[in-house]
Each structure stands twice: as C-alpha cells, then as structure tokens.
C-alpha cells in the first residue's frame, strides 16, 4: 500500500520524490503512532496529590483537518492517529492538488478501522473538494487542525472555531560544542533533502 500511495501522490501533486514519500508513509506515520500508543488520552491523565490537582482529558468531538499539497501522504494519517487516540472523529479537507491522494488514504484508514471493529466513520473526507466545503467544515467542526499556507491557516484562525495551525516551516537546528559534527551534518542533510524538502518540517536553518 505504501508504494502505491507514494507513487500516486507524486503523480498527482508533482511535488517531492518517490523515496521520500515512501519513507514518510512507511516510517514517519508509524513513528507517530508508536510515540503515543501507550499514552493515556482520555480520563485522568495526570494527578498531583500534594496540590490536589487532577488533569482530565476528554474528546473534543469532530475535528476538521486541513491538509496541504506538500505532505498529503502523511499529514492526514498523523492527524487521524491523534484524533482517534483521543476518541474523536476527524474529517479531512485536502488541498485540491492532492484530493485523489487524500481519498486513497482515507479509504485505507476506514478499511483499517473496520478491520479492527471500529466505526469507519471516525475518519472521513469532505467528498467533493472545494473552498466552500472547507469553509463550512471549519464552521461546523469542534476543533480545526490546519496545516498549509499562511492564508489558509489565517482563515482557520478567523473562522470562529478553536484552531491549531502550522504554516510556513522554519525548522531551526542547534549544533553545540557537544555534538558529533559529522553525524549532525549527515542528519541535517537527510532532513533537508528528504522528499526534496517538500515538508514544512524539513531542516531549514542551522545555529552552530
């Protein structure tokens, strides 16, 4: 499946490269899952007995996820993992340039949910992709997760719905005197060139 999605994404968006997209689908999404798989995400998640403070997590409801053309193979998956982990439903509105890729990914996630005995409708897409549909999703959902250009993230923040946004990336890497310079340089190179730096999380600046 990862091979098919990687090639389909490249063909549709004409952004990045096959190897980068394959790695993001097969490793980055899995790593995101493993980071939180054992974390408690609903109910009492933290308790300070001495101060009599209890932190309780609960679902927010339906999450509206806006997905970019630069990382459509991984962003919807990672957002869906986090949404479902918190017992939320999620509806993904893709960039028009990646609508078919998004449909393929959503269909795969829905099939996986059904296979596990969970409701497939926990993960959905908006259907026909349009600006009007995306704007309506932002009005109707309980929380927006917006990843994309500055204008789109700005629209999410101005929608009247609580929103978390990520716009243009500027990932800064700090290399101090304790670092293995050769190892650091190689890791920065890999990050900057992965998927031809299509993702906003690619290393962009170095402080040494």
Describe each model-derived feature in a short phrase.
Residues 57, 143-152, 163, 179:
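Buried, small/hydrophobic-residue-enriched core segments of structured protein domains
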Residues 92, 124-127, 145-148, 163-166, ...:
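General beta-strand structural signal in soluble alpha/beta enzymes
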Residues 78, 85-86, 153-208:
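ALDH superfamily catalytic-core signature
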Residues 61, 142, 204:
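Conserved acidic residues
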Residues 35-111, 116, 159-161, 170:
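Conserved small-residue-rich beta-alpha loop and adjacent elements
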Residues 42-55, 123-141:
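A structured beta-alpha segment of the ubiquitous adenosine-cofactor-binding alpha/beta core
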Residues 1-53:
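N-terminal Rossmann-like NAD(P)+-binding subdomain of aldehyde/semialdehyde dehydrogenases
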């Amino acid at each position: 499946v990862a091979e098919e999605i990687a090639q389909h994404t490249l063909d549709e968006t004409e952004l990045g490269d096959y190897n980068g997209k394959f790695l993001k689908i097969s490793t980055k999404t899995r790593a995101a899952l493993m980071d939180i798989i054992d974390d408690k995400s609903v109910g009492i998640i933290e308790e300070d007995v001495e101060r009599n403070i209890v932190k309780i997590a609960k679902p927010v409801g339906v999450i509206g996820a806006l997905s970019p053309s630069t990382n459509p193979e991984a962003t919807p998956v990672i957002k869906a993992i986090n949404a479902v982990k918190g017992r939320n439903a999620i509806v993904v509105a893709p960039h028009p340039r990646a609508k078919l890729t998004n449909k393929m990914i959503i269909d795969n996630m829905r099939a996986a949910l059904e296979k596990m005995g969970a409701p497939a409708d926990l993960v959905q897409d908006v259907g026909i992709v349009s600006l009007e549909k995306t704007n309506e999703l932002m009005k109707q959902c309980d929380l927006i997760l917006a990843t994309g250009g500055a204008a789109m993230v700005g629209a999410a923040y101005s929608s009247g719905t609580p929103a978390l946004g990520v716009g243009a990336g500027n990932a800064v890497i700090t290399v101090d005197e304790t670092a293995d310079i050769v190892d650091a340089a190689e890791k920065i190179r890999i990050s900057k060139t992965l998927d031809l730096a299509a993702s906003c999380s690619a290393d962009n600046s170095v402080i040494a």
